Every structure is written in structure tokens, then in C-alpha cells.
Amino acid sequence: MRQRTIVCPLIQNDGAYLLCKMADDRGVFPGQWALSGGGVEPGERIEDALRREIREELGDKLILQKITPWTFSDDVRMKTYADGTKEEIYMIYLIFDCVSANREITINEEFQDFAWVKPQDLAQYDLNVATRKTLSLKGLL
């Protein structure tokens, strides 16, 4: 089984948290709401990977004022690729508390939508298992 280390920002701005809706035809959690983030490349430093993933997935106009390592988690997930093939992967999630100075987001093709969500409204979203676990650990669900 392949192993992936994932950097995952829990981005907050003015009391709301950023959720991204995965595209229906790709990813580990197609069509569900998730946190952004992605894999650490070989030889890449963890914070560099976090900043790269944010830039790739959310655009280069989102300004992070603060990045704090928070916790980690792991599990086994079935990834569905765009061509319909599937792969079981051991995932290690490195989760960071992030505070943004703005809300300027330009999502890439991995996502179909995004939302800034107040804590009291998070439970109304179809959150993927990993995001639900993270938000519960944080005391937000």
C-alpha cells in the first residue's frame, strides 16, 4: 500500500473557516466538502509544501498571517482517479491552524466551490470523514 503525507491547512478568517467542495469526478472524497491541502513532494520541507498547496489550490492572492502546526492524523483511504481507477492509500495528515488576512480565493480544478463557514454552520455541510474528524478534534462540531 502506498503512503502519502498530506499537509492540511485549517484556514480561519474573521471567525469563519474555509471549506472547499471537491469536484464530483476526482479525489479521495468526490463531491464532498473538505479542507484544502495535498501531498508533500520528495525532498520538500513541510511548510513549503503547505504554502505550495495553498497557492496551487486556492490561488496566490490569499495571504496567511499565521501558520501554526496543530496536530496529525492518519487513516487508509480509497482514492478515485479521474479515469475511474481506484487505489487504497495510507494517509498521514499534518494539520495546521492558519489565519488569513483576506478571503481572496481562486479555486483550481480539484474543487467546484468554496465557502467561508461560521462554526455553528459547519454541521450543515456534507463534510468528508477526514474533515469531520479534524473539525471535531478542534471542538468545532
From Swiss-Prot:
SUPFAM superfamilies, from UniProt?
A: Nudix
- Domain named Nudix hydrolase: residues: 1-141
Q: What is this enzyme's EC? A: 3.6.1.9, 3.6.1.12, 3.6.1.-, 3.6.1.23
Short motif Nudix box, span: 38-59
Against InterPro entries, the record matches this protein to: Nucleoside_triphosphatase_NudI, Nudix_hydrolase, NUDIX_hydrolase-like_dom_sf, NUDIX_hydrolase_CS, NUDIX_hydrolase_dom
User: Got any disulfides in this one, which pairs?
Assistant: none
Q: Which terms does the record give in the GO molecular function aspect?
A: dCTP diphosphatase activity; dTTP diphosphatase activity; dUTP diphosphatase activity; magnesium ion binding
Q: Which cofactor does it need?
A: Mg(2+)
Q: Does the keyword Hydrolase apply?
A: yes
- What's its catalytic activity? a ribonucleoside 5'-triphosphate + H2O = a ribonucleoside 5'-phosphate + diphosphate + H(+); a 2'-deoxyribonucleoside 5'-triphosphate + H2O = a 2'-deoxyribonucleoside 5'-phosphate + diphosphate + H(+); dUTP + H2O = dUMP + diphosphate + H(+); dTTP + H2O = dTMP + diphosphate + H(+)
Assembly behavior? Monomer.
Q: What does this protein do?
A: Catalyzes the hydrolysis of nucleoside triphosphates, with a preference for pyrimidine deoxynucleoside triphosphates (dUTP, dTTP and dCTP).
Which family does the record assign?
Answer: Belongs to the Nudix hydrolase family. NudI subfamily.
The protein's name is: Nucleoside triphosphatase NudI
